[in-house]
Amino acid sequence: MGMYQPEIETMDRNELEKLQLERLQKQVKNVYENVPMYRERMDKKGVKPEDIKELKDLAKLPFTTKQDLRDYYPFELFAADKKDIVRIHASSGTTGRQIVAGYTRNDLDMWADCMARQIAAAGGDENSVVQVSYGYGLFTGGLGAHGGSERIGAMTIPTSSGNTERQIRLMIELGATHLCCTPSYAMYLGETINEMGVKDQLSLKAGIFGAEPWTEDMRHQIEQSLGIKAYDVYGLTEITGPGVSLSLIHI
């Protein structure tokens, strides 16, 4: 397992909690001053930003629900001015009205750093070749993984999803070492690779899979069919896409 930002990733627990509190206080003040819904709900609970003095005070804050994100669509929960928003992503809306998330330039920088950490944890570095087979577009997967791969300095192949046999040819010819896609697509790639009889031509070492639930049985199938270590990356439109956390099998 490697690290992209060791000074952050190995931070002392006390220093980490101090940083978490500073950022929580800053964020609460920000939304209280800039988002009417949060200000109204905090006032209703009798909570002011200055009441957040320690991490456990998080429990004093009102919940935000998925329905809130739909009800205040598209921009009413944005704490940043629209002129500072440089990108929009959105959920698929399969279980209700879609939600949108606005990203500032700073958000995108932070997101790229977070995803770079996940790629490093899966053994990636500036010598790696990362094939991004998540879909690109409003879905966060493609551009999220792409940003992290470029941030770490890897050669990035933006194949997106589909056109599977071409993907496999590129994977072989360009020497992809890391694969980023959904676990179901990884399984399909593995099946197709074995049907084509080209598994021994792969240079893959690891896969970073997310955007849908998968089981340990699926993990084992993917690892066997592609000859890699398979890692589960977490993310959600409301925070960032992939890059929030990565599961590592280290015990």
Name every feature range the model reports, one short phrase each.
Residues A112-V129, N163-A176:
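Conserved ATP-dependent adenylate/AMP-binding module captured primarily in the ANL superfamily
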